[in-house]
Swiss-Prot record:
Cystine connections: none
Lineage: Bacteria, Pseudomonadati, Campylobacterota, Epsilonproteobacteria, Campylobacterales
Name this protein carries in UniProt: Ribonuclease 3
Cofactor(s), by name: Mg(2+)
Active-site residues from the entry: 58, 130
Catalytic reactions of this protein: Endonucleolytic cleavage to 5'-phosphomonoester
SUPFAM superfamilies: dsRNA-binding domain-like, RNase III domain-like
Amino acid sequence: MKNKRSQNSPYVTPDNPYLTLEKALGYSFKDKRLLEQALTHKSCKLALNNERLEFLGDAVLGLVIGELLYHKFYQYDEGKLSKLRASIVSAHGFTKLAKAIALQDYLRVSSSEEISKGREKPSILSSAFEALMAGVYLEAGLAKVRKIIQNLLNRAYKRLDLEHLFMDYKTALQELTQAQFCVIPTYQLLQEKGPDHHKEFEMALYIQDKMYATAKGKSKKEAEQQCAYQALQKLKEAK
């Protein structure tokens, strides 16, 4: 006897190659062409790609994530909220959410991008995620996007707070520089001062022998994290 629930499921169709993706997302697209467009990188040279959807998705996600953080962290001031949002609304942040649904497995990229592992690049993967969320917004509205993002944040982050996200900046930067420049950042101690119980460390961060940031902290690790945050912002602005 067939399971009635699976029979009536919006995901179950004989010709749906995106079944697993839609299940992971928690949303079944009514128009599969819209879904395909969201997954199509411009390198494919097709009439429709995901650039316009990416533009819309960027605005939608900025609003949804900003709203979620506003309600969740009522004790944070504007500066802390901005820092939190910058961590999530970024190539690294969206790549993390995209990988939570294995989005990279469904991207449509050119053969040259395939050879260079383009589907794993944060720039391509994060853009596709923005486009995907724009597609959901166009079909189902803001409330559905909000629900999906809340679920993905819970899935992708063990703890969603400033301290936890801040400690991830070094990893985020290393992933980005490996993808863009095929190198990892290096850190150098510039100065150490103060008594043992109240030390202050100043670190510098270099990418391809170019200094990208300097920062101070109560430990080398803290200063390195602050350097990584600054470098991420610079690379984001340079795109």
